[in-house]
């Protein structure tokens, strides 16, 4: 057998051409200290701020938080008990991402997007970076569509628009979460996807909340992101950004989303803990100097996009817990200055039975007024004035023995309107129902009823409208306005039912 040297050369050449030498270069470091959810590593010379790293021996993920001259401070996103000194850390060359999309609806997840509800793995088709730049002014348009909370007092006096940031602030146990949950329940059938982020709460409280959402059929369009009090500070720190990324997915798809951060006080405390452990210099109330930026970069991501960019929206309802009514503390003042208004809840009102316990004088919505439907604008305009005058006169009336008839009439009207502002939890009202009830209140139809009978009248009147005047409600809902014809029809309906109510139940 004769071997042809030319053939051998060809075979060798083809083999050499197809040969690729793969050098797997990885920037690695060694753990020099670990504890309290923090690790310090020597090496990782080219690691970038907020880049993901992996502890090779355990597979645990971390994030490069502090870049110092001779070491890197890493926050550990998960269990740190098994990580020991001398373990290897490698760069992952990416920043943190979470799964997003409709696969997450109806699920309870941790800030890394891992399921906590025992319903199996999440089949997410897309991932989004947790930290992204907020859309610029060019990409936005003014807030012009209402986000109905279903709560009369808020929709009439402190209206929220899609794309707005409205702070809910108050002491513990004043009904802050209740407002947020009612808002989620009220989005049923309105095409708004909801993300509820629980930061530093008891796991049992979150479980009860998820159960309530299931009872009202609200989990179908809601994702719950949980970093409970038992979780590391690092997971509590990342949770709101992860929830925001999940909401942004819908916004950039041209849809409407609502994200609730409950609450950012605990978020700031978690960030303070991480910063102090990493020896960053403390400032006021021991918070680091960039705690304002911590919340501003999160809340600026809420926006109403211009139609050219899909016209989607992301509405943010951050919650802040105050200590002893002190809204002039560091974190409350920061978040008040970032948001487009606040709903201030007061313990004294709450314990007096005025629920939702909103202080109308200190609460404001800076952009939502433009988004109110015309029908609501017509009834809410004089409502604000009536209540403001009533609150002014109420204090004065306590000292005065004799009041002139005009003052007495204003106080009478105010008392009935305040009673009308009360609302049960988990019972949001449609906008046309709110308009009908408030119209009766501001036009004096309730002035001669006992204050105790106002809520009974409201309940029965709404039932009467649904059964006998459904066409009227439908027209208000569809036209979003209260023209002369509809107003006359509504007035007649109120008068008819009132005479019936007085006959049956008295004044």
UniProtKB/Swiss-Prot annotation:
PROSITE patterns: ATPASE_ALPHA_BETA (PS00152)
Key words of the record: ATP synthesis, ATP-binding, Cell inner membrane, Cell membrane, CF(1), Hydrogen ion transport, Ion transport, Membrane, Nucleotide-binding, Translocase, Transport
Pfam families xrefs: ATP-synt_ab (PF00006), ATP-synt_ab_C (PF00306), ATP-synt_ab_N (PF02874)
Site (Required for activity): 363
One term under GO cellular component: proton-transporting ATP synthase complex
Superkingdom of source: Bacteria
Enzyme Commission numbers on file: 7.1.2.2
Catalytic activity field: ATP + H2O + 4 H(+)(in) = ADP + phosphate + 5 H(+)(out)
UniProt enzyme class: translocase
Binding-site residues for ATP, renumbered to this chain: 170-177
Entry membrane topology: Peripheral membrane protein
UniProt keyword Membrane, yes or no: yes
SUPFAM superfamilies in UniProt: C-terminal domain of alpha and beta subunits of F1 ATP synthase, N-terminal domain of alpha and beta subunits of F1 ATP synthase, P-loop containing nucleoside triphosphate hydrolases
PANTHER family for the chain: ATP SYNTHASE SUBUNIT ALPHA, MITOCHONDRIAL
Family label: Belongs to the ATPase alpha/beta chains family.
Complex and partners: F-type ATPases have 2 components, CF(1) - the catalytic core - and CF(0) - the membrane proton channel. CF(1) has five subunits: alpha(3), beta(3), gamma(1), delta(1), epsilon(1). CF(0) has three main subunits: a(1), b(2) and c(9-12). The alpha and beta chains form an alternating ring which encloses part of the gamma chain. CF(1) is attached to CF(0) by a central stalk formed by the gamma and epsilon chains, while a peripheral stalk is formed by the delta and b chains.
Stored HAMAP family: ATP_synth_alpha_bact
Function: Produces ATP from ADP in the presence of a proton gradient across the membrane. The alpha chain is a regulatory subunit.
Name of protein: ATP synthase subunit alpha
Organism expressing this protein natively: Thermosipho melanesiensis (strain DSM 12029 / CIP 104789 / BI429)
């Amino acid at each position: 057998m004769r071997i042809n040297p030319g053939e051998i050369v060809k075979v060798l050449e083809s083999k050499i051409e197809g040969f690729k030498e793969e050098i797997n270069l990885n920037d690695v470091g060694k753990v020099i200290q670990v504890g309290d959810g923090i690790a310090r590593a020597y090496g990782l010379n080219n690691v970038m701020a907020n880049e993901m790293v992996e502890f090779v021996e355990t597979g645990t993920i971390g994030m490069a938080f502090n870049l110092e001259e001779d070491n890197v401070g890493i926050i550990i996103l998960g269990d740190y008990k098994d990580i020991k000194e001398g373990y290897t850390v490698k760069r992952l060359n990416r920043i943190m991402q979470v799964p997003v999309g409709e696969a997450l609806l109806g699920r309870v997840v941790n800030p890394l997007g891992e399921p906590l509800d025992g319903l199996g793995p999440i089949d997410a088709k897309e991932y989004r970076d947790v930290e992204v730049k907020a859309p610029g002014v060019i990409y936005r348009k003014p807030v012009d569509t209402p986000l109905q909370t279903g709560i009369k007092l808020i929709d009439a006096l402190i209206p929220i628009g899609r794309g707005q940031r409205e702070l809910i602030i108050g002491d513990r146990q004043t009904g802050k979460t209740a407002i947020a949950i009612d808002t989620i329940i009220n989005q049923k059938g309105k095409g708004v996807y909801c993300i509820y982020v629980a930061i530093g709460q008891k796991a049992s409280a979150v479980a009860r909340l998820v159960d309530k959402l299931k009872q009202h059929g609200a989990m179908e369009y809601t994702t719950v992101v949980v970093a409970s009090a038992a979780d590391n500070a690092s997971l509590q720190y990342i949770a709101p950004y992860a929830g925001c990324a999940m909401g942004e997915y819908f916004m950039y798809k041209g849809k409407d989303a609502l994200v609730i951060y409950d609450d950012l006080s605990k978020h700031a405390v978690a960030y303070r803990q991480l910063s102090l452990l990493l020896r960053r210099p403390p400032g006021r109330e021991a918070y680091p100097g960039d705690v304002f930026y911590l919340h501003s970069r999160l809340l600026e991501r809420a926006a109403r996009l211009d139609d050219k960019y899909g016209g989607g929206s992301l509405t943010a309802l951050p919650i802040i817990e105050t200590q002893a009514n002190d809204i002039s503390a560091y974190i409350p003042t920061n978040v008040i200055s970032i948001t487009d208004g606040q709903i201030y809840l007061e313990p004294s009102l709450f314990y007096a039975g005025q629920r939702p316990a909103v202080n109308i004088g200190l609460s404001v919505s800076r952009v939502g007024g433009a988004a109110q439907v015309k029908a609501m604008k017509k009834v809410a305009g004089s409502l604000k004035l009536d209540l403001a005058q009533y609150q002014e006169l109420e204090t004065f009336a306590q000292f005065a023995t004799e009041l002139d008839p005009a003052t007495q009439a204003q106080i009478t009207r105010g008392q009935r309107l305040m009673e009308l502002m009360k609302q049960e939890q988990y019972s949001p009202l449609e906008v046309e129902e709110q308009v009908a009830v408030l119209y009766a209140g501001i036009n004096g139809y309730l002035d001669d009823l006992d204050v105790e009978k106002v809520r009974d009248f409201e309940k029965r009147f709404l039932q009467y409208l649904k059964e006998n005047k459904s066409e009227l409600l439908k027209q208000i809902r569809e036209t979003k306005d209260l023209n002369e014809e509809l107003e006359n029809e509504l007035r007649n309906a109120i008068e008819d039912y009132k005479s019936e109510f007085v006959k049956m139940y008295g004044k």
